[in-house]
């Protein structure tokens, strides 16, 4: 019997990709309906402290997982508001990647940008929630429940950044 300890280093989104490959149809939520491709290529995107991305493609007996650093690609604005957001973020960061916008910290940047651009003031309740819990989580919660117009606008812009 060997006393060797085996260590495996794994990209976080590679781990997510391997997990996704084991899910069944009932485990997933469809965002946009299309024609099912049982062994089609899959893309996994997740926003957290950064923007994780991995691709899965069918390799005969299962999916091969390909993690990436796609969150570090340059942000490409789609409208005038996103142009202005990009310009405002170039001041502190220089180069602006998608991860600077589509992540927990990115949601805060969008929220601040909208507020500074005359998008209104957050509600007292949202400000209180932001002091008690993770700020991005509070903004998301208030937006999803339509409790704060500025939070709704920020989350809408965040989702636009994901391309959904």
Feature locations, PLM:
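Adenine-nucleotide phosphate-binding core of ATP-dependent small-molecule kinases
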Residues: 93-102, 108-109, 113-164
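Phosphate-binding/catalytic loop of phosphoryl-transfer enzymes
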Residues: 1-101, 108
């Amino acid at each position: 019997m060997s006393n060797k300890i085996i260590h495996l280093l794994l990209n976080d989104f590679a781990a997510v990709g391997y997990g996704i490959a084991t899910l069944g149809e009932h485990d997933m939520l469809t965002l946009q309906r299309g024609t099912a491709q049982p062994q089609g290529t899959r893309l996994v995107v997740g926003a957290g402290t950064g923007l994780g991305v991995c691709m899965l493609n069918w390799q005969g007996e299962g999916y091969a997982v390909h993690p990436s650093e796609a969150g570090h690609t340059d942000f490409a604005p789609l409208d005038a508001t996103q142009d202005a957001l990009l310009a405002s973020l170039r001041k502190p960061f220089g180069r602006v990647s998608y991860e600077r916008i589509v992540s927990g910290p990115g949601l805060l940047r969008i929220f601040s940008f909208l507020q500074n651009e005359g998008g209104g003031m957050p509600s007292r309740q949202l400000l209180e929630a932001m002091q008690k819990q993770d700020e991005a989580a509070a903004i998301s919660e208030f937006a999803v429940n339509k409790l704060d117009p500025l939070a709704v606008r920020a989350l809408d812009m965040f989702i636009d950044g994901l391309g959904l």
